[in-house]
């Protein structure tokens, strides 16, 4: 009984630690007090001011564009890489697997400096393309690991049976592997989107003044105090992220049920 109460209290403390700051942020986005120290009444004026803050909206647009592109490319390349690591034997396979974990475990500052040196050596101007390549680089291993873990749970006999029945490798990939891996693919995309949206360290090294993204914009703003418009924008992004997670899970579930029934 005591152990159950301790476990319940421990879990409650963890959830409170995780979600109370988010709740405070959402509440303050509707608080008429500019400093958010005490509640002074409900208002939506911070959302109205946000709509007129061109620099903040432009940074948000840049971040959303970067997150969508980097998540899409990282998911595409990472999913195919995971399939290759799962299905085929080739020279250098252990090296490729090891390098993926090296990228995942490397400190952000190390990756940031490495990418900056690479761009300088190649003569690439810092801006959209350097930032996109960098975000794809650090998102890619997470997609590979997520999709590969899903593939490892497959029944290999199903793939062998499809091959014995004359299915080509492309048909096996399209009809069996991808539909069954779709939940992991969707999870990899959402994870990549989130990693791209909140990255500060790598982005601060590899972006240029012509392409300012939201995390760097907010970081520069909070040095002189958190603006209520930032609370409003964070609330909108939080709702957007929640909608994407729910939608990706529903889409992945529907595709898994529908496509696996069509395998012949």
Curated annotation (Swiss-Prot):
- List the transmembrane segments: 8-27, 66-85, 101-120, 129-148, 177-196, 232-251
Domain ABC transmembrane type-1: from-to ranges? 60-248
Q: What is its main location?
A: membrane
What is an example of a Pfam family matching this protein?
Answer: BPD_transp_1
PROSITE patterns the record matches: ABC_TM1 (PS50928)
Extract the SUPFAM superfamilies matched here: MetI-like (SSF161098)
Q: Does the keyword Magnesium apply?
A: no
The UniProt entry lists membrane topology as: Multi-pass membrane protein
Q: Does the keyword Heme apply?
A: no
Q: Which GO terms describe its molecular function?
A: ABC-type polyamine transporter activity
Q: Which domain of life is it from?
A: Bacteria
Periplasmic topology: which positions?
Answer: 28-65, 121-128, 197-231
Task: Identify one Gene Ontology CC term for this UniProt entry.
Answer: ATP-binding cassette (ABC) transporter complex
- Give residue ranges on the Cytoplasmic side: 1-7, 86-100, 149-176, 252-264
Q: Output the InterPro entries linked to this UniProt entry.
A: Bact_Polyamine_Transport, MetI-like, MetI-like_sf
| Keywords carried by this UniProt record | Cell inner membrane, Cell membrane, Membrane, Transmembrane, Transmembrane helix, Transport
The processes (GO biological process) annotated in the record are: putrescine transport; spermidine transmembrane transport
What does the UniProt entry say about where the protein is found? Cell inner membrane
Query: Member of which family?
Result: Belongs to the binding-protein-dependent transport system permease family. CysTW subfamily.
Q: What does this protein do?
A: Required for the activity of the bacterial periplasmic transport system of putrescine and spermidine.
Q: This chain belongs to which protein, by name?
A: Spermidine/putrescine transport system permease protein PotC
**What gene name is listed for this protein?**
potC
